[in-house]
């Protein structure tokens, strides 16, 4: 027995060796087992409790750190969750179990679909067996159900395999994840075994993603491609999780491939012993959805990470758009002779042709009733309905989900205030199911594939044109038809000028009868006051940051009062003075403070 092992017995006396890893419990049962011995399921709770106490008291020591502004911001935006570890190490690729309260188990074989979320219109005529990849990778690719390469993969894979730095302009849903993972895995598999088999190997492939959902999705894809690369492993470190849990997981299950969100990656560089040393082995650095990484304010973190990895490396940037800021970071991160590969055809970066786009302009106090009416009709017309409703903020998302749940619609919600385990569970359920309505903030706008979405509704003005397009892109995928509806208040109509070149037309606002309005208002009244207070504060913050609407503060206050009235409140909620100061709204007449 090794340190940390426990010798347990079932009720019939069968000896079981339990090895406690920081994030899991492995049970080893002797090969010779008495006939009729009882299963271990009844003893699982006691075993988990015993090992949990041991791990908590004897886990690896990690340094305490000061709570940074980044922590506070991530908790505010991302919520709290637990870490997730995906491993593909050793014989028989497996996934480590997770303790109670952590993110639920997910399996590469069960996540997504066989086509990897790729629209068939993006497939090329080139097969994977026609390119120079190893037999192990080719076998994994075939097992994953991939036969033909997408146009993005066809254009980028040969160049990346030559070892060149690449800036690729590529839309989500076009196979870009495999486009950077497959050649990177080829680089890693060619490294000397001594570099890959050591107890704590260097991190050789580092992938940075803007969101937790995308990071998990990339790791799942990597796990598929690593199926026959027995000595390579992948892990995920993501914002909003327990740093100490991730530190212990990386000690117990060292990996060569790390997928991370930038803020959490920076945390590990600053607070995890030996982590910076492991980054010195990075051979390939990937920035996935580089434009969104920069839009979310991660530039400083990215620059620090770039400074932490070797200069002699291969760098890959994949981005749906290539604005000036992406070009600036490419000059910092990449060699001067990098290749720019544009896989987006003129006009193709816009919405899918199969999506019917409509907008409605209606007073704010009718939005909930109109939303309910539209959903009822869509559910009645399509038995296989699958709807995503995008809201402006996480707390407004929560409010809308609670109202629609009161109206007895089949609702799921996903946003940054949900724990990672809850988000993963909802995301997996929505991906695999039909007959569901997902109310979401922008965590689902890009990089996450949900097949067969029949309708996308955007409630409130999007932040910009690109956000509108990316949200709409959740439907009309793989050549299938879809519908999009943008629901705006009269004072949000200005946004239409930014999408006037798209095929969008005005829809007639439904005349919601008085009985339906009464039902909806009753549902709104049943929502807890705390949810309304949080939604009001978040709504005010969102529109205050809008350059058009937030410019005139007195008008903004009146609009916020309209939103408050739509929640069936006679008086707008009070907001803490500290929050108002941060918004620049302290001493603005009409706002109540605490």
Curated annotation (Swiss-Prot):
Alphabetically sorted, this entry's keywords are: ATP-binding, Helicase, Hydrolase, Nucleotide-binding, RNA-binding
Asked if RNA-binding is a keyword of the record, the answer is yes
User: Which Cys residues form disulphide pairs?
Assistant: none
GO MF, any single term? ATP binding
For this chain the motif DEAD box maps to 288-291
SMART domains named among the record's database cross-references? DEXDc, HELICc
Query: Boundaries of each Helicase C-terminal domain copy?
Result: 370-520
Q: Where is the signal peptide?
A: none
Locate the motif Q motif. Answer: 126-154
The keyword Ribosomal protein belongs to this UniProt entry's keyword annotation? no
Tell me the segments the record calls region Disordered.
Answer: 56-80, 92-121
* Recorded superkingdom: Eukaryota
Provide the top EC class.
hydrolase
InterPro entries named in the record: DEAD/DEAH_box_helicase_dom (IPR011545), Helicase_ATP-bd (IPR014001), Helicase_C-like (IPR001650), P-loop_NTPase (IPR027417), RNA-helicase_DEAD-box_CS (IPR000629), RNA_helicase_DEAD_Q_motif (IPR014014)
A Pfam family cross-referenced in the UniProt record is: DEAD
Query: What are the residue boundaries of the Helicase ATP-binding domain, all occurrences included?
Result: 157-340
EC code(s) of this entry = 3.6.4.13
Q: Which reaction does it catalyse?
A: ATP + H2O = ADP + phosphate + H(+)
Binding residues for ATP, per the UniProt record?
A: 170-177
Q: Which family does it belong to?
A: Belongs to the DEAD box helicase family.
User: What is stated about domains?
Assistant: The Q motif is unique to and characteristic of the DEAD box family of RNA helicases and controls ATP binding and hydrolysis.
PANTHER family found in the cross-reference section: RNA HELICASE
Identification of the protein by name: DEAD-box ATP-dependent RNA helicase 25
Q: Which organism is it from?
A: Oryza sativa subsp. japonica (Rice)
């Amino acid at each position: 027995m090794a340190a940390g092992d426990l010798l347990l017995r079932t009720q019939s006396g069968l000896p079981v060796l339990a090895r406690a890893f920081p994030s899991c419990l492995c049970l080893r049962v002797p090969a010779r087992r008495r006939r009729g011995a009882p299963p271990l399921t009844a003893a699982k709770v006691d075993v988990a409790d015993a090992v949990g106490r041991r791990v908590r008291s004897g886990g690896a020591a990690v340094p305490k750190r000061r709570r940074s502004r980044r922590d506070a911001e991530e908790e505010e935006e991302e919520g709290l969750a637990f870490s997730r570890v995906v491993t593909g190490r050793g014989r028989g690729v497996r996934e480590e179990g997770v303790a109670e309260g952590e993110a639920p188990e997910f399996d590469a074989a069960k996540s997504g679909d066989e086509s990897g979320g790729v629209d068939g219109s993006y497939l090329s005529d080139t097969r994977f067996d026609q390119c120079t990849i190893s037999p192990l990778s080719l076998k994994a690719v075939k097992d994953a159900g991939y036969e033909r390469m997408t146009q993005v993969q066809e254009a980028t894979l040969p160049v990346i395999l030559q070892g060149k730095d690449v800036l690729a302009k590529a839309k989500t849903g076009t196979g870009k994840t495999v486009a950077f993972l497959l050649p990177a895995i080829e680089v890693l598999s060619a490294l000397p075994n001594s570099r890959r088999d050591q107890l704590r190997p260097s991190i050789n492939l580092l992938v940075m993603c803007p969101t937790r959902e995308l990071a998990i999705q990339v790791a799942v894809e990597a796990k598929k491609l690593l199926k026959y690369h027995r000595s390579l492993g992948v892990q995920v470190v993501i914002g909003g999780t327990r740093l100490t849990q991730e530190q212990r997981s990386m000690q117990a299950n060292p990996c060569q491939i790390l997928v991370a969100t930038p803020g959490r990656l920076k945390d590990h560089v600053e607070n995890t012993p030996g982590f910076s040393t492991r980054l010195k082995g990075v051979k390939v650095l990937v920035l996935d959805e580089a434009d969104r990484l920069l839009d979310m304010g991660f530039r400083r973190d990215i620059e620090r990470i770039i400074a932490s990895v070797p200069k002699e490396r291969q760098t890959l940037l994949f981005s749906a758009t290539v604005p000036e800021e992406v070009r600036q970071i490419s000059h910092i991160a990449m060699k001067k002779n990098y290749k720019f590969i544009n896989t987006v055809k003129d006009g193709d970066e816009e919405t899918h042709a199969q999506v019917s786009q409509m907008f409605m302009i209606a007073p704010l106090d009718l939005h909930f009733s109109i939303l309910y009416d539209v959903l009822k009709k869509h559910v009645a017309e399509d038995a296989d309905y699958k709807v995503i409703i995008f809201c402006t903020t996480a707390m407004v998302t929560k409010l809308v989900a609670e109202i629609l749940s009161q109206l007895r619609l089949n609702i799921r919600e996903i946003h940054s205030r949900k724990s990672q385990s809850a988000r993963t569970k909802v995301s997996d359920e929505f991906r695999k199911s039909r007959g569901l309505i997902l109310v979401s903030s922008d965590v689902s706008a890009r990089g996450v594939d949900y097949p067969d979405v029949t309708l996308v509704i955007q409630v409130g003005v999007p932040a910009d044109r690109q956000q509108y397009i990316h949200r709409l892109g959740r439907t009309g995928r793989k050549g299938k038809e879809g519908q999009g509806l943008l629901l705006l208040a009269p004072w949000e109509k200005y946004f239409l000028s930014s999408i006037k070149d798209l095929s969008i037309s005005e829809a007639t606002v439904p005349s919601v009868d008085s009985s339906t309005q009464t039902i909806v208002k009753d549902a709104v009244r049943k929502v807890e006051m705390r949810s309304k207070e949080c939604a009001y504060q978040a709504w005010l913050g969102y529109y205050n940051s809008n350059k058009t609407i937030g410019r005139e503060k007195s008008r903004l206050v009146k609009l916020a009062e309209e939103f408050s009235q739509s929640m069936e409140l006679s008086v707008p909620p009070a907001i803490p003075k500290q929050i108002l100061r941060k918004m620049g709204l302290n001493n603005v007449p009409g706002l109540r403070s605490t």
